[in-house]
């Protein structure tokens, strides 16, 4: 006869034959599981693999875009350290992408015994290309109208080939004011999407894929220590995010990380540690990259983690849903707000620029998502496996 106590299931007659002490021990474990609140239960590997939507990730995306907007709008009086910390929002984006894309690819392979590269690239293209090229065309029109003869405008035209081919992160230096420079992060992600699925197919196993990422991480870390700009330009959070996905997909890797990342308070503790790593000067990029991946892991392994309530709150979830549009449009929104404040005689030196940019970016991104992006997103369903 099978008896279940909470998460413990066993054959009661068989266990009774093992002796009263063994049966009593198992019975006490079952009762403890019954008495233990659900939000304290540890997630098993099977539970993790059964999760279809990591709902906390939208909240993390919201933090990412709000941090980026803060970086571009923070008033001078907050200081360079606090203002520049917002740039790490891109690193969080990277870690989320590395983790989520790798997880989706691994689960597709587990279900269908193969990864459909064509379907993957079509889905990614429908998500990224329409808005990216739409905003790029808008920038071309605005530069032609407003800055065609300026040095900055001419530089924009010269860089168009790199913006169009998603190589701006490699060939467009940040030297003064560079129009559309923020697209470097989208370029880095597109390069990851282009290379990583093929690598996963070629290496053939989780262990070899993980070893390959560890080698890349070590080489890039060595390059950073040596001061090599090429290696410093590699987005390490994408690598650590992908490595996290590989480890969690494996039962051994999951069991290794679960005691550290799967506790209810892991997300809060690691989030505080990440905040310190970002704010304290001199922390190496690879350390921050590991923290970003650990935070993503802590917010996905344990479904009812301590930070979940505010990460899945409706405003955070919604901002996370439209975060790509906010990222692509926030610099235009910032410029509109700065010029509007100037036109009414209001100096743009306080927090109002950040607040107004967030509000306008949210409205514009919502309109873009509803009336433009969603049309292309519906086409993705034909390529979903």
Regions found by a protein language model. Give the residues of each.
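Extreme N-terminal basic, low-complexity initiation segments
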Residues: 2-9
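Alpha-helical transmembrane segments in multi-pass integral membrane proteins
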Residues: 38-56, 63-87, 102-118, 141-145, ...
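Membrane-interfacial loop-to-helix junctions in multi-pass inner-membrane proteins
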Residues: 51-57, 85, 112-133, 150-157, ...
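Residues within membrane-spanning alpha-helices of integral membrane proteins
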Residues: 58, 62-65, 97, 130-133, ...
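Short alpha-helical catalytic segment bearing the HExxH-like zincin motif
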Residues: 58, 120, 182-187, 327
């Amino acid at each position: 006869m099978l008896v279940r106590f909470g998460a413990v299931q066993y054959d009661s007659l068989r266990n009774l034959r093992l002796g009263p002490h063994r049966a009593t021990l198992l019975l006490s474990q079952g009762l403890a599981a019954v008495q233990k609140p659900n939000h304290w239960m540890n997630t098993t590997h099977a539970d993790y693999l059964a999760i279809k939507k990591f709902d906390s990730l939208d909240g993390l995306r919201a933090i990412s875009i709000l941090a980026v907007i803060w970086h571009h709008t923070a008033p001078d009086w907050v200081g360079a350290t606090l203002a520049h910390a917002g740039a790490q929002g891109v690193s969080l984006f990277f870690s989320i992408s590395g983790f989520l894309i790798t997880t989706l690819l691994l689960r597709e392979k587990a279900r269908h015994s193969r990864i459909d590269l064509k379907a993957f690239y079509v889905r990614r293209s429908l998500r990224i290309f329409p808005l990216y090229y739409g905003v790029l065309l808008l920038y071309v029109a605005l530069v032609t109208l407003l800055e065609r003869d300026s040095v900055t405008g001419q530089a924009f035209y010269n860089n168009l080939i790199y913006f169009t081919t998603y190589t701006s992160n490699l060939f467009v230096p940040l030297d003064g004011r560079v129009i559309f420079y923020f697209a470097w992060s989208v370029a880095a992600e597109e390069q990851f999407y282009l290379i990583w699925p093929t690598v996963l197919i070629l290496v053939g196993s989780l262990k070899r894929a993980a070893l390959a990422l560890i080698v890349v991480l070590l080489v890039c870390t060595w390059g950073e220590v040596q001061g090599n700009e090429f290696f410093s330009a590699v987005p390490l959070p994408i690598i650590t995010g992908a490595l996290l996905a590989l480890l969690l997909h494996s039962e051994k890797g999951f069991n290794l990380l679960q005691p550290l990342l799967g506790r209810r308070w892991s997300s809060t503790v690691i989030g505080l540690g990440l905040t310190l790593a970002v704010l304290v000067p001199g922390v190496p990029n690879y350390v921050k990259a590991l923290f970003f991946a650990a935070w993503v892991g802590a917010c996905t392994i344990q479904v009812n983690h301590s930070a979940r309530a505010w990460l899945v709150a409706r405003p955070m979830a919604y901002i996370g849903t439209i975060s790509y549009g906010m990222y692509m449009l926030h610099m235009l929104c910032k410029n509109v707000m700065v010029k509007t404040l100037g036109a009414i005689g209001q100096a743009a030196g306080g927090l109002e620029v950040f607040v107004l940019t967030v509000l306008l970016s949210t409205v514009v991104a919502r309109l873009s998502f509803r009336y433009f992006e969603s049309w292309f997103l519906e086409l993705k369903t034909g390529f979903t496996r």
